From Swiss-Prot:
One Gene Ontology CC term in the entry: cytosol
Source organism per UniProt: Pediococcus pentosaceus (strain ATCC 25745 / CCUG 21536 / LMG 10740 / 183-1w)
One Gene Ontology molecular-function label: nuclease activity
Key words, A-Z: Cytoplasm, Hydrolase, Nuclease, Ribosome biogenesis
InterPro entries: RNaseH-like_sf, YqgF, YqgF/RNaseH-like_dom, YqgF/RNaseH-like_dom_sf
GO terms under biological process: rRNA 5'-end processing
Subcellular location: Cytoplasm
EC numbers on record: 3.1.-.-
Family note: Belongs to the YqgF nuclease family.
Protein name per Swiss-Prot or TrEMBL: Putative pre-16S rRNA nuclease
Length: 146
């Protein structure tokens, strides 16, 4: 049993999963979506939920630096509702401020990755950081792993 972390954007969803003990998170893939056309990648998410035996979702909440909520927060909450309705599994949110910036910094400094390569993995790495922060903060869904 694992938790699935998600970095929800308007065109992609970065996906990560925890290990079975809830200690670490690893990036899995980036699922293409299109909010304007109401294509949310749910079929692929269904496959991943089954493959990894997911028991709950942790979505990044992209609050503004002053802690206010903008339109992307609403989009993340709506995606969470869609997941809850589709899977009947619990969801929780993790403040994701600066996770994409941190992911990009890691790719530049530690992996010396080119801009084109960074673009292909950044959402997956951001999802991993979101879930890792959640696990380290002992979020309420961690008990579901036991």
């Amino acid at each position: 049993m694992r938790l699935m972390g998600m970095d929800v954007g308007s065109r992609t969803v970065g996906i990560s999963v925890s290990d079975q003990l809830g200690w670490t998170a690893q990036g899995v893939e980036i699922v293409p979506i299109n909010e304007d056309e109401e294509i949310f990648g749910i079929e692929r998410v269904k496959e991943l939920v089954k493959e990894y035996d997911v028991v709950g979702f942790v979505l990044g909440l992209p609050k503004n630096m002053n802690n206010t909520e903008g339109p992307r927060v609403e989009a993340a909450r709506n995606y969470g509702k869609l997941l809850e309705e589709t899977f009947g599994l619990p969801i929780d949110f993790q403040d994701e401020r600066l996770t994409t910036v941190e992911a990009e910094r890691m790719l530049i400094e530690q992996a010396d990755t080119s801009r084109s390569k960074r673009k292909k993995v950044i959402d997956k790495l951001a999802a991993s950081l979101i879930l890792e922060n959640y696990l380290n903060g002992h979020g309420k869904l961690i008990d579901r792993l036991k």
